[in-house]
């Protein structure tokens, strides 16, 4: 895959505070990003955007790849769920583990998908 790491935001990382364990949060977000890279088109782009307000900090991880069906969107966070075409490379615990870590720390994770892109939304409540 062609990976281009750019920071297009003017948001300074020192401006953001997320409650919880740094290492576990990093693992959860890295897992979601890795998944987005693996399932993006060959020349696709994975975008990471962060919004921060008084109520929550949200991380949006967006990729361009195959659309996730409504059924897939409901099952993607279930332990051991893996698409048949990816079963050789996946144990199906990455996204469920990320979800468990995020929720254990008071956050939420969701996914939205259409023909153009898939977006994982992680919100950490302040």
PLM feature spans:
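Conserved micro-motifs of the catalytic ATP-binding
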Residues: 13-20
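A residue-level detector for a conserved hydrophobic packing site
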Residues: 25-29
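Short helix-loop "hinge" at the ATP-lid/N-box region of the Bergerat-fold HATPase_c
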Residues: 35-37
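Short beta-strand/loop element within the Bergerat-fold HATPase_c
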Residues: 43-55
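Short conserved segment of the HATPase_c
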Residues: 68-80
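Short alpha-helical Gxxx[C/S/T] motif in the catalytic ATP-binding
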Residues: 94, 98
